[in-house]
Amino acid sequence: MAKATDVRPKITLACVECKERNYITRKNRRNDPDRIELKKFCPRDGRHTIHRETR
């Protein structure tokens, strides 16, 4: 099982516009302590939108 204080936890990225959770990725907590935002393709909207980390 993964520890709660894992350095590279799995995070879910949700589209800002349609709120759909499209991507699962990992991040390094030491380099990015805040929530990350990435511009990714949203299949529901059919275009590139900002995806924000969800908890």
Curated annotation (Swiss-Prot):
PROSITE patterns hit by this protein: RIBOSOMAL_L33
InterPro entries in alphabetical order: Ribosomal_bL33, Ribosomal_bL33_CS, Ribosomal_bL33_sf, Ribosomal_zn-bd
Pfam families cross-referenced by the UniProt entry: Ribosomal_L33 (PF00471)
A single GO molecular function term of this UniProt record: structural constituent of ribosome
GO-annotated cellular components: cytoplasm; ribonucleoprotein complex; ribosome
GO annotation (BP), single: translation
Keywords: Ribonucleoprotein, Ribosomal protein
Matching PANTHER family: 50S RIBOSOMAL PROTEIN L33, CHLOROPLASTIC (PTHR43168), LARGE RIBOSOMAL SUBUNIT PROTEIN BL33C (PTHR43168:SF2)
Record-stated family: Belongs to the bacterial ribosomal protein bL33 family.
Protein name according to UniProt: Large ribosomal subunit protein bL33B
Higher taxonomy: Bacteria, Bacillati, Actinomycetota, Actinomycetes, Micromonosporales
